[in-house]
Amino acid sequence: MIEKVNMYHPDKVADRIAGAIVDYAYSLVPNPRIAVEVLVGHGHAAIIAESSVILERQVVEGIVGRIAGLSKGSVKLVQAPQDSHLAANQASGFRCGDNGVFAAKWHPGYERATTLAAEYGSIFIADGKYMFDFHRNAATICQSNATESDIRAVATEFENVTINPLGAWTGGTDADTGATNRKLGSDQPFCNPNGLHGKDLSKADVSISICVNAISRKLGGAFVKAYCSIGDEEVDLFVDGVRVGRLEFSEAVEFARSYITDLGGFEKFAEYGMRWDYEHD
């Protein structure tokens, strides 16, 4: 069973806002240091950004308006400089910004679920949450602002489909408050607690997570783990329990940079999490 939400789920709205703000920071300097937390719901958005760059309020308000449809008066923005100790750690180059344990185990069902969620999200421009059981050819589709007949017309590949168990619903940020990095189980094939969104590439949570998922996929679903401590310039890498060497963190950053660029940016990454719509070696 695989859970997936579409890009209009409140938590993904928060992720997309955070991702767009990170994109904005990268438009200002090549390697910003930024971490963004977003809480959005019921006509309000609260944003806290720890950043090495100054974010123009009107740009941030424009991002929130575009993604969440909120007016600029409903946005509370708090900016703070990056902690001096954390800044010093990255002053001379890319080094792991935190302790971390990362794991990935790719499987084709996740990619199929991601493709379906994106397809449904392109048809129903509204909050949606899905459960896919490809072994039983079954699905539970909770899709707001859509009729049962419209949903059944789309979900034709499943023999057993449960649609909106509680009946029709409206969803969105007026029904449920969204928060950054609260849908990590939907965003990667093997759930980890490492936050993927609202962070620059110097954060191991982002770069190492992307790398281990890519390695696992390339190896056909091997169980890949990585360990790092704050300040490390290399990361211990294990495949199916066997240590295979160390990965230069700077190389992980550049791989992740290329991945994010090819995908279309951090906002695009935030829509559906890890995805491989193209070949990236």
Model-assigned labels for residue ranges:
Residues 143-216:
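Glycine-rich anion/phosphate-binding loop at the beta-strand->alpha-helix junction
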Residues 1-35, 270:
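N-terminal, positively charged regions that mediate nucleic acid binding
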Residues 56-76, 150-158, 239-266:
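A glycine-rich helix N-cap at a beta->alpha junction
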Residues 38-44, 64-175, 271:
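Glycine-rich, mobile lid/loop segments that gate access to catalytic sites or pores
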Residues 221-281:
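Internal helix-turn-beta structural module
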Residues 2-8, 37-51, 140-142, 187, ...:
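Short glycine-rich or small-residue beta-strand-to-loop segments that form or flank ligand, phosphate
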Residues 38, 130-145, 174-192, 233-244:
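Short beta-strand elements
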Residues 30-43, 127-133, 222-237:
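Short edge beta-strands and adjacent turn/loop segments
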